[in-house]
């Protein structure tokens, strides 16, 4: 869509956006004193919003912007007048290949905290750039859903805070019995006083030894990338735009320059982001940049992108002082790609930041560095980026936030839905590229029992999985064929097993994109393989695993598409299983396959 915006001049209000689709009718609430509360109706997208404004002490409610639907209703109520809305971000996209674009998710940030995300965090990311302003009104487009959203902002008068600085940053250790502990001490001045932040952590023998440094005598040099190829912005077609840096003004400046893409990012952190090191791609060659920041991080993160199919599109984060009224440093970082979200890494405290460009890829970093990563900015190359599903369940971004709306019933054992991109995730090494598991065209499992094939349908509405102590006993599927429900026969034995799981999808908004599992013999003396575990991946997340994850792993990893039917072999157990896939090749073209593991690039 076309982005229209006007920026504030000399403290005057500004309008930004709208972000989203072109459908629906335009609306504009106008400008008020502040926002008091927001009511959001949402499900697979944002159905509607309604806002309570304040106008010179009087409450004013807007009309409901959007449709009458919504499976969930949330109210964001600010602590007026002390709390006010400073930023909004979210995603927009279509529910299916042919659908119109609307707002899929929204997150609101005040001067105190974040609220959300509400909806499904899927599609193209957008964000209001941080500019020291507060939101005083909304505008956009609306129909059956909230099709697009924009904001009116008003600059906030700046306060004159006393200057302060960090004087000393040290890392020390002490022994207690046979254990060794390390701690980080930061000392900073506020007038004539000191504030101290202490971080304790058990020593990790794999980490390098730490050293004490005084900021006045720290040996900091301006880094330059070491490469045999001279690079400049003019050598990259189309040039690039620079956003930021955001954060503090301490340390010295660095600029890695402009490359073709980003392959990997290594972070070191404790109370803030201590350092960052980036592996770039320059015309097919991996080029490592220098480490920017200090030493002494207690936590190390490695973010490996599946380059070139996975592209870094946005960098967001927060910054703030390490102590009361101290200088600002980067506190947290989140990396968004065309496949999902990596992070956040660090504590999301303080003002947030992002760059405004909707379509493009990050091709370089810049900022300021000292004992910490003081600030960060990005070079962005404007281009069209396609939104892709992860190429393998191994690469799925799976935060532990199961606040979704999809339904799973009768689940006494290992029955869960894990959203693929929503909320805060467990901080592990994300996006680590793993080789796909070798497998044939399916079905996967043993060659015992009788072959069966349900055929191809319009979609899948629900699945019943019955498991025994050591294998999947049976599976039964409810399909959709042109709006009519069609049940398959039960594939497998008649035993009730240990547990039966009902996986009910939000059809037609939710579709199965991949299955994975394990197969192997029932016991060491059995020469026949059966399916021992199953997991189902949908457009919203992952269901399972159901059964014991032992034996040989298999997956139906493929290009973007959806599962329209199952086939396999069965006897007293589910001996083998395969899928019928409908693959999307772009321009609304599709084709069917009975296999699933062949790369189609």
Swiss-Prot record:
Keyword Repeat: yes
GO MF annotation: an example: carbohydrate binding
Domain Jacalin-type lectin: from-to ranges: 13-155, 240-382, 438-583
CDD domains for the chain: Jacalin (cd09612)
SMART domains: Jacalin (SM00915)
Keyword terms: Lectin, Repeat
InterPro entries attached to this UniProt entry: Jacalin-like_lectin_dom (IPR001229), Jacalin-like_lectin_dom_plant (IPR033734), Jacalin-like_lectin_dom_sf (IPR036404)
Entry similarity comment: Belongs to the jacalin lectin family.
Protein name as annotated: Jacalin-related lectin 3
Source species: Arabidopsis thaliana
Lineage, opening ranks: Eukaryota, Viridiplantae, Streptophyta, Embryophyta, Tracheophyta
């Amino acid at each position: 869509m076309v982005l229209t915006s006007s920026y504030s001049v000399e403290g005057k209000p500004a309008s930004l956006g709208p972000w989203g689709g072109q459908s629906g009718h335009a609306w504009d609430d106008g400008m008020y004193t502040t926002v008091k509360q927001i009511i959001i109706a949402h499900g697979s997208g944002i159905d509607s919003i309604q806002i309570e404004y304040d106008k010179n002490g009087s409450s004013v409610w807007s009309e409901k912007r959007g449709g009458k639907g919504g499976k969930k209703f949330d109210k964001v109520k600010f602590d007026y007048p002390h709390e006010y809305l400073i930023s909004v971000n979210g995603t927009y996209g279509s529910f299916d290949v042919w659908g119109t674009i609307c707002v899929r998710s929204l997150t609101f940030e005040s001067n105190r905290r974040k609220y959300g995300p509400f909806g499904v965090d899927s599609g193209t990311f957008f964000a209001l750039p941080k500019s020291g302003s507060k939101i005083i009104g909304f505008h956009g487009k609306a129909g059956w859903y909230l099709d697009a959203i924009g904001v009116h902002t008003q600059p906030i008068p700046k306060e004159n805070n006393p200057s302060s600085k960090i004087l000393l940053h040290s890392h020390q250790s002490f022994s207690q019995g046979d254990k060794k502990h390390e701690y980080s001490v930061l000392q900073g001045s506020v007038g004539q006083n000191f504030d101290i932040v202490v971080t304790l952590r058990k020593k990790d023998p794999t980490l390098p030894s730490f050293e004490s440094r005084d900021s006045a005598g720290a040996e900091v040099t301006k880094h330059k990338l070491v490469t045999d190829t001279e690079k400049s912005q003019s050598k990259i077609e189309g040039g690039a735009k620079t956003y930021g840096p955001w954060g503090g003004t301490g340390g010295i400046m660095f600029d890695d320059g402009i490359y073709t893409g980003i392959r990997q990012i290594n972070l070191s952190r404790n109370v803030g982001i201590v350092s960052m090191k980036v592996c770039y791609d320059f015309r097919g060659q991996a080029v490592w940049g220098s480490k920017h920041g200090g030493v002494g991080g207690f936590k190390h993160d490695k973010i490996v992108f599946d380059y070139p199919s996975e592209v870094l599109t946005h960098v967001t984060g927060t910054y703030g002082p390490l102590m009361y009224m101290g200088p600002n440093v980067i506190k947290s970082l989140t990396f968004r790609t065309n496949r999902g979200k990596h992070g956040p890494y660090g504590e999301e405290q303080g003002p947030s930041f992002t760059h405004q460009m909707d379509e493009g890829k990050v091709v370089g970093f810049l900022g300021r560095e000292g004992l910490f990563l003081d600030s960060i900015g990005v070079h962005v190359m404007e281009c069209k980026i396609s939104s892709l599903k992860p190429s393998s369940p191994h690469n799925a971004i799976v935060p532990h936030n199961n606040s979704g709306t999809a339904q799973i019933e009768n689940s006494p054992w290992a029955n869960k839905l894990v959203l693929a991109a929503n909320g805060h995730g467990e901080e592990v090494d994300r996006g680590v590229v793993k080789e796909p598991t070798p497998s044939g065209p399916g079905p996967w499992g043993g060659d015992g029992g009788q072959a069966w094939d349900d055929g191809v349908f319009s979609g899948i509405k629900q699945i019943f999985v019955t498991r025994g102590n050591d294998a999947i006993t049976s599976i039964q599927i409810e399909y959709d064929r042109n709006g009519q429900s069609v049940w398959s026969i039960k594939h497998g034995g008649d035993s009730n097993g240990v547990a039966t799981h009902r996986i009910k999808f939000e059809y037609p908004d939710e579709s199965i994109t991949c299955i994975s599992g394990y197969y192997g013999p029932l016991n060491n003396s059995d020469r026949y393989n059966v399916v021992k575990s199953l997991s189902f991946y949908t457009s919203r997340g992952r269901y399972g695993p159901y059964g014991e994850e032992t034996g040989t792993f298999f997956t139906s990893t493929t290009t973007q598409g959806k599962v329209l039917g199952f086939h396999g072999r069965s006897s007293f157990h589910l001996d083998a299983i395969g899928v019928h896939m409908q693959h999307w090749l772009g321009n609304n073209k599709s084709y069917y396959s009975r296999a699933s593991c062949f790369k189609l690039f």
